[in-house]
């Protein structure tokens, strides 16, 4: 019997896959537990429509990430911070990924999730820093951060 898997089933099939399985296994386990449905023409067309929708969504998300990368790559997009500096030239506090994401939203109206910023440790020195950001699995960008001394 041909079935369409609704979710991944170990050693049998992945979500969205159409596969021939034994009748008893299909009826007594897969369909009963809502892990698969019969591969009728109607269900196959639903699956194709669903896959097309998912592909369009993925393409839109990728395009948004590329646009955000272009905005971040602009020479004008430098996130500014003014912090108190100690006598040794180091910041009294630090600039974290959350603060960078907040300032991006505040200064440039760009929304970047703090978890996408790959800041190994918080910035503790003044000057211009580049922070890598993984906006999408296929799109990475560099965010320029300028930390200056607060007068």
Swiss-Prot record:
Keyword 4Fe-4S tagged: no
InterPro entries, per the entry: Ribosomal_bL9, Ribosomal_bL9/RNase_H1_N, Ribosomal_bL9_bac/chp, Ribosomal_bL9_C, Ribosomal_bL9_C_sf, Ribosomal_bL9_N, Ribosomal_bL9_N_sf
GO molecular function per UniProt: rRNA binding; structural constituent of ribosome
GO cellular component: ribonucleoprotein complex; ribosome
GO biological processes: translation
Pfam families per record: Ribosomal_L9_C, Ribosomal_L9_N
Record family assignment: Belongs to the bacterial ribosomal protein bL9 family.
Protein name: Large ribosomal subunit protein bL9
Organism from which the protein derives: Oenococcus oeni (strain ATCC BAA-331 / PSU-1)
């Amino acid at each position: 019997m041909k079935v369409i898997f609704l979710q991944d089933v170990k050693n049998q099939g992945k979500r969205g896959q159409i596969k021939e399985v034994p009748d008893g296994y299909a009826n007594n386990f897969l369909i009963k537990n809502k892990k698969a449905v019969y591969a009728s023409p109607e269900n196959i067309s639903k699956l194709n429509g669903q896959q097309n929708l998912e592909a369009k969504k993925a393409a839109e998300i990728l395009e948004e990430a590329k646009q955000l990368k272009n905005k971040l790559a602009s020479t004008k997009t430098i996130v500014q911070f003014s912090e108190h500096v100690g006598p040794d030239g180091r910041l009294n506090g630090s600039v974290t990924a959350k603060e960078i994401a907040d300032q991006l939203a505040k200064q440039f109206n760009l929304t970047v999730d703090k978890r996408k910023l790959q800041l190994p440790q918080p910035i503790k020195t003044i000057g211009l820093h580049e922070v890598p950001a993984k906006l999408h699995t296929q799109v990475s960008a560099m965010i320029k951060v300028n930390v200056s001394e607060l007068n």
